[in-house]
Amino acid sequence: MAWSDRAVRADPSDVTGLVRHRCTALWLAAALLAATLLSPATAAAAPQPWNGRYQMITYASQKAGTSPASRQQESDFGAVFTLATQCSGNRCVATVIDGPRPGNPTIPQPTRYAWSGSEWASSYDWLWDCFLGEGNQKQWARATSWASYQPQPDGSLKGTWHTDIAEGACRGSVVMPVAAFPA
């Protein structure tokens, strides 16, 4: 008997059982898919709050990128900041609530970092103050920056600060490692 003959001569009660089995399997798969889609991932739903005092460091001595500014010598810099996290629904935001103001007045304040599911991230538009050498006036240029900090097992956070400078003598990108350590 050929395979096609067996399929044609199937017992009707066997077909009903097979259909019932497949429907049950499909129903269970749909229920599992719905449960997965309706419950957010643990990392996204429950970040470790970023609260308290942190020594935040920008490793400017290690900067890279395509902007001429990325090749200018600069020392690492940092300060102690206090952050507080607030969550609403499935969105958490850590806000800098205390610490020194930036030297550049165009950087939006306060700084806020949103939890993405794996890191704290911030982005903002501002004006880069392009250093053109001793005795020359700085050139202000439109820029967009984003910083990300990934929590580490030791309680610190490490990441990157990336700036795209849109115009002028410093046009290009500047990328620097960043870190935050409990203070």
Please describe what each predicted stretch is.
Residues 139-165:
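Internal, hydrophobic beta-strand segments that form the core of beta-sheet-rich folds
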Residues 61-72, 129-138, 165-174:
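Flexible, membrane-facing loop/turn or short amphipathic-helix motifs
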Residues 156-183:
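Edge beta-strand at a domain terminus
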Residues 71-143:
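Predominantly extracellular/secreted and cell-surface proteins with exposed
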Residues 46-53, 84-91, 113-120, 148-157, ...:
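A short, structured loop/turn motif at beta-sheet edges
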Residues 46-72, 157-161:
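Tryptophan-anchored aromatic micro-motifs
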Residues 58-59, 98-99, 124-127, 161-165:
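Beta-turn initiation residues at beta-strand->coil junctions
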Residues 1-45:
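Secretory targeting and sorting signals
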